[in-house]
Amino acid sequence: TGLRSNDMGYCTTGEVLKMIKEDMVNSIIGDEYIEDADEKQQKITALCEDAISDACAEIDGYLAKRYKVPFTKTPQVINKLAKDIAVYNLVSRTGIDESEREKTFLNRYNAAIKFLTEVAKGTISVGAEDEAVGSGNAANGFKMKSSGRIFSRDSMRGW
């Protein structure tokens, strides 16, 4: 169906880390050089979790008017966009060199944002109609009760 369970976010750290080449990890971590492999893995995993959290929040911001977010089941397209945005978040920590391979990450991020903008406008669907805002059962409806009018033309006559 193109949906998957959403336990933590719209993508996993493993999925995001698969998209990053090993030689990029040091530049993502930043100025501190970490020789110990376990320590390096902990650092990049923590950064990746933050990047995923930010990506999911960004996606939810675009989709909140059309869908009930966060999704309980992640549509496949949202998984892809979350990975692209999270990778961009990681790579852009130290700036994007548009003449290098980072340009690909910038292009994928821009494409993701363009797609989300179109979803927000209603021209594209993410395939999660069961979670669309306002698609719930309206059989119970709602009632509105108010007191009678206090001020009217007749009651205010002469003022």
Please place each PLM-identified region on the residue numbering.
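Core structural elements
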Residues: 77-88
